[in-house]
């Protein structure tokens, strides 16, 4: 597999074409951002950890019957993925009140929600990733009703699977955001990444009841170095994959 021209560079990843028209080459970067890029820093080792974490999570999800764009990890910071047409949506699942949700509704952070909440935002830094409802998504032609039904179904299935995965490593899955895309043959699949950059993860191991962040809130809120937290998540996930006999794509 040959890496060809760079197609895109975002806040955390670079995307390249390959000599296979159906496969893209992803390189994870060390840049950390918050507030739609208003806060930035280079953090040594972050790209490698996120590449490793998302790879093992996609493997764990596949073992639970959830397919994705992920093909395989090919180096410390790189992986191959299926080429897809992406829906310009951030798909957010919330299990516990935290962050902007808690502020928006005046709910104490850490309050358990009676049922998981599915939210959508238009993926646009220029517009500030505005919220959009189901009718708006269909009316603007972002996705058809049938596509949106499938995206929503998959988001809830991913949430159920991730809650199972993280509960087994003593981590509370507070919320997360994902993206979805459509393959050339019309399949809608989970895409982008699932890492502590895109999830809120609270440690349950010490049993103190105090919130111990294992995610990008450490950077976002100036609470400390993210690297030890990301390393801890990766180590626990690898042990789970080994215990479950999950086949690794690398």
UniProtKB/Swiss-Prot annotation:
Any GO MF annotation of the entry: ATP binding
Matches recorded under InterPro entries: SAICAR_synt/ADE2_N, SAICAR_synt_PurC, SAICAR_synth, SAICAR_synthetase
Catalyzed reaction equations: 5-amino-1-(5-phospho-D-ribosyl)imidazole-4-carboxylate + L-aspartate + ATP = (2S)-2-[5-amino-1-(5-phospho-beta-D-ribosyl)imidazole-4-carboxamido]succinate + ADP + phosphate + 2 H(+)
Keyword ATP-binding: yes
One Pfam family of this chain: SAICAR_synt
GO biological process: 'de novo' IMP biosynthetic process; cobalamin biosynthetic process
Annotated transmembrane regions: none
HAMAP family: SAICAR_synth (MF_00137)
Designated name of the protein: Phosphoribosylaminoimidazole-succinocarboxamide synthase
Gene: purC
